[in-house]
Amino acid sequence: MTAPNETTIRFLLDGETVEVDGLPATTTVLEWLREHAGRTGTKEGCAEGDCGACTVVLGEPHDDGGVRYRAVNSCIRFLPTIDGKELVTVESLQAPDGALHPVQQAMVDCHGSQCGFCTPGFVMSLLALYLDEPAPTRERVLEALAGNLCRCTGYRPIVEAARCAGVYPEPARWSRAGAADAARRRALDALARDADLRLPDFHAPRSLSALADAVAARPDALLLAGATDIGLWVTKDLCELPPLIYLGEVPELQRITADAGGLHIGAAVPLSSAWPAIVAQRPALAEVAQRFASPPVCNSGTLVGNIANGSPIGDSMPALIACGATITLRRGEHQRALALEDFYLGYRRKDLAPGELVEAVHVPAPVEGERTACYKLAKRFDQDISAVCLGMRIVLDGEHIADARLAFGGMAAIPARARHAEAALRGQPLRDAVVETAAAALAEDFTPIGDMRAGEGYRLRAAGNLLRRFLHEQTGGTVRLAEVTV
């Protein structure tokens, strides 16, 4: 096999090496499949990573020596980012004799398809689950399908199909044993490149120093990780993007390190790896981790990408700010640390110099007496944008609150701390009167706006109710909520 050309995208598809030249860097995987490869089984529904009709599976080398297969949204995934990986589509599953894969046959037998438009996406999400877990629980199935929408079946037969797919005979293609075959890893290793992938308006450095040099040399470039937000600028806003510098090939940014001081999460670590590490440290954050986004989005998007995006309704920032997270910024060889809440200067404005990048986020370890939670209010449980999000951390010394940190999303132009409410809690006992004083102080911290997700009055009163919920949960008491209207 010839060495990879630094201007040619190479990946595996059905055991064959595919080489792609001459396409724009913002060509999506879905666009390539349907318009260039003739693989029309993968559908476009929403073009923003919400509906799951476009789901495919990507395989990439794993530290255990094998290949890890994960579902991703092809509608917002740029083609150069699958260089060196294995692409699996719904057409890949059928056996040479025409027999269906177990996840497909289970969908047929359980009557899991009606109009059929969403079915290929469900099948691919189920394939990723099938390869990962032979006997998934119902809860695990629901998590795996959180990014797939169907408007026909009501989901019950699809969930049944997922539960029973594992009892079918092993398929000729894409069995668990076949996916774990060492030959697949060898085929991916053969695609590994020493030189950076360089396309017009796309550069994928392969070391942290090379990345820092590239960003410093092109401060006008746009840094790209998972494209779960940037992808929409192309598919929905039809934007012409500036040159892209891709973080996903930098080994130093793909690591999570843990020590007595906490977690250090690199800028290219996907959300599907970052959140479990955080939840292992703070189990109370499990719900917001589950609700953050669907598996396909979390398998592409990164925690640092969510931080760097700086949206006032980004769900990671309230929890991280409450935990006292800091970020590491780099320009060339120079690094500096910054408290996460100080990173945001105003709407879409950040303390980020030209040519500087966010290298990592550090989440401090819990301390004795710490209680933490994060609550998200949205119109849907899965795959929805917050109206209000509260991240809260208190440290108890006996019955008194020695320290308190409250951070909100959806209440201001930036993710922000509620410093007046914090002051009302510090040094006080866990009592109803203290809770009410802190809830009232939120009006001094925020003047929220009204929009399509919630009115200003709703946001302020709902924020107070989330504060009441947290503090009453710590005492085991009854939550007395203020009445709110949207």
Residue spans for each PLM region:
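S4-like RNA-binding module at protein N-termini
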Residues: 58-89
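Extended heptad-repeat alpha-helical coiled-coils characteristic
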Residues: 92-95
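A basic, amphipathic helix-loop patch mediating RNA/tRNA/ribosome contacts
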Residues: 24-56
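C-terminal structural segment of proteins
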Residues: 12, 17, 57-61, 70-74, ...
